[in-house]
Amino acid sequence: MKERSIFSRIKQTCILLALLTTTICQAQNVSNLPVPAPHQLKWHEAELGVVFHYDLHVFDGQIYGQGNNRINPVEDYNIFNPTQLNTDQWIEAAKAAGAKFAILTATHETGFGLWQSDVNPYCLKAVKWRDGKGDIVRDFVNSCRKYGIQPGIYIGIRWNSLLGIHNFKAEGEGEFARNRQIWYRHLCEKMVTELCTRYGELFMIWFDGGADDPKGMGPDVEPIVNKYQPNCLFYHNVSRADLRWGGSESGTVGYPCWSTFPYPYSHSNATDGVQDHNKLLAHGDPEGLSLIHI
């Protein structure tokens, strides 16, 4: 009886040790997982948002052709002449659809700015509409706050048909192109500063196609956003993405879809070891140590 009792206790002790070891290992594994930053939690809570694309091509009467419009400047920017613009109506419609945030293209592929820029002359100051005093970004943000919608701003610096910027790069060769590239870099940084400092707290800053590499000739925008909009979502550059594109514009993502990712940025086809980047964007990586939500 004593031997049976001793063996029973040894067995119980072994089981307890095994369970304890498993629990410790699981706790260690969990402790290695990334956790969302406070602004990333806001992204989850927001659930549904809308994007308002508004640019010169709204008024040219043509079917939008991205390839041509990226390289051909609009001949007469005074075609921009809305007669019934009502950002309250935009945001009321978004709210009725269940949206909790809204994003406006402050500048898109033409390079035309929808605000009163002091650094980019190609903006609403240049047109006859509202005697050159219109500021649609301000109207939009005010409407968002009026109806309890979180405002975000979309900034397109990858393309600028007026200045001949194609995929972040100034067209041309030699010193001519280099000087224009440096000038454009500084212009972008100044525009981002304006948008980050004039309109109060923003939900998101979205760079169309990213913001290029500041270690090369790209604008160094992340420190600007961090300084003036520390709580907003940043999307994105070559070193940081608080959220990610789903790998296609179909409106769907892969299954399963993980929020974890192998590195803290997205849209990098040059990353070693990645064979199918769009697949990675669609599915994420269950073993990833960075958190980038869709």
What are these regions (language model features)?
Residues 28-292:
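Mature catalytic domains of secreted/periplasmic carbohydrate-active enzymes
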Residues 2-14:
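Bacterial N-terminal signal peptides that target proteins for export
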Residues 8, 22-24, 49:
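A composition/secondary-structure signal for short, hydrophobic, low-basic-content segments
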Residues 20, 293-294:
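Short, basic, low-complexity termini and linkers enriched in Ser/Thr/Gly/Pro
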Residues 13-23:
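Bacterial N-terminal signal peptides
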